[in-house]
């Protein structure tokens, strides 16, 4: 009988010629049992997913707000942020459905730090097992605070470790056109937003929605880590996220109206989520405030074409580089620059006020 080491070292002719090594990863069940979702967390996820569904389908006039750090690199700071956000989530619960952005994986145009799961110690040691443990524990802690979480899905396996804690999910601009990500979205238990392409076009996102609404079969793993064929039911809670593109932003009223006309042609409710960051802010974090003002004017004017927003926010504004031997600034992003906490409070108040104004306009 082969030992575990021998099983890992099985060689096949002409295979793995560029693979340096293969390390086993913990099966999902190991972490699900170590960090099970509490009843409170499970109830929160269920309720928030239902609220997101109702907002997306026009049954709830509140605004879905996905807000938080560009990426998570310091669990302590992330939990600190979540505690602060909980206060504002409760304060604006009648106008906003606030969900914390808890992103552990970062898609890259070329290379760079790929996120807490991939490299949790920020030192190129790639301790994935530790990354998965840290991520699941943090999601448990955040949800236990009463703050629902949102994440971006980059592969077909990681969701088996963390998806039960996710109340909303995103497929990024670089992966919206990917068939496997559309298939994945069709089987996720939460609402999923598809970003428009990096070129600014929305056709790929519309196509992605259509694909994700259908049923699919694809390869993944079971909770016990065995390779398996997954059969999905299709996801009716998919939508478009406008994030701007190479040609500039697409959050203005005329841009939103143009996209909504395309959505309406497809037989869906003509509304979108607007990403305040990325190409909509020209990657200048402070411009998120300008985007917010414009979007709030649209909402306050009575527009129902914007049902949700996405904001990159942290405790300390801006961003920092990882420098060997230099202490990190607590609560500041190491990926995209974010607005700070003071501006976060302003943004959420403005969004809440805009929803109140929209209700008055529309009766």
Model-derived segments and their meaning:
Residues 2, 9-16, 82, 95-251, ...:
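Active-site-facing alpha/beta catalytic cores
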Residues 17-56:
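N- or domain-start disorder-to-order transition segments that initiate the globular core
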Residues 64-77, 336:
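Conserved phosphate/anionic-ligand binding catalytic regions in large, soluble enzymes, centered on
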Residues 68, 274, 340:
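Conserved, mostly hydrophobic/aromatic
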Residues 86-87:
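N-terminal intrinsically disordered, cationic/polar leader segments
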Residues 243-245, 250, 258-273:
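A contiguous, surface-oriented mixed alpha/beta subdomain in the mid-to-C-terminal portion of proteins
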Residues 314-359:
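Internal helix-turn-beta structural module
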């Amino acid at each position: 009988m082969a030992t575990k080491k021998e099983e890992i070292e099985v060689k096949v002719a002409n295979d793995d010629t560029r693979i340096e090594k293969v390390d086993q990863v913990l099966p999902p069940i190991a972490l699900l049992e170590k960090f099970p979702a509490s009843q409170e967390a499970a109830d929160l996820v269920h309720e928030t997913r239902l609220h997101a569904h109702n907002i997306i389908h026009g049954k709830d006039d509140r605004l879905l707000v996905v807000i938080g750090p560009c990426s998570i690199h310091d669990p302590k700071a992330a939990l600190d942020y979540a505690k602060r956000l909980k206060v504002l989530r409760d304060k604006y619960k009648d106008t906003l459905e606030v969900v914390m952005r808890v992103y552990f994986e970062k898609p890259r145009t070329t290379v760079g730090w790929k996120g807490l799961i991939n490299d949790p110690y920020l030192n190129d040691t790639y301790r994935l097992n530790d990354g998965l443990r840290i991520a699941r524990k943090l999601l448990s802690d955040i949800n236990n605070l009463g703050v629902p979480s949102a994440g971006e899905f980059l592969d077909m396996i990681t969701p088996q470790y963390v998806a039960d804690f996710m109340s909303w999910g995103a497929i990024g601009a670089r992966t919206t056109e990917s068939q496997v990500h559309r298939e994945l979205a069709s089987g996720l238990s939460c609402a999923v937003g598809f970003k428009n392409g990096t070129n600014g076009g929305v056709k790929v996102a519309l196509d992605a929605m259509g694909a994700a609404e259908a049923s699919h079969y694809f390869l993944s793993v079971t909770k016990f880590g065995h390779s398996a064929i997954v059969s999905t039911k299709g996801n009716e809670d998919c939508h478009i996220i406008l994030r701007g593109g190479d040609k500039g932003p697409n959050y203005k009223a005329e841009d939103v109206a143009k996209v909504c006309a395309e959505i309406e042609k497809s037989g869906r409710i003509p509304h979108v989520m607007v990403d305040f960051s990325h190409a909509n802010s020209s990657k200048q974090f402070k411009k998120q405030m300008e985007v917010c003002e414009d979007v709030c004017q649209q909402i306050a004017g009575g527009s129902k074409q914007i049902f949700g927003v996405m904001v990159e926010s942290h405790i300390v504004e801006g961003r920092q580089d990882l420098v060997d031997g230099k202490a990190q600034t607590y609560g500041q992003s190491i990926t995209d620059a974010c607005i700070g906490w003071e501006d976060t409070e302003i943004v959420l108040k403005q969004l809440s006020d805009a929803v109140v104004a929209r209700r008055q306009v529309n009766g």
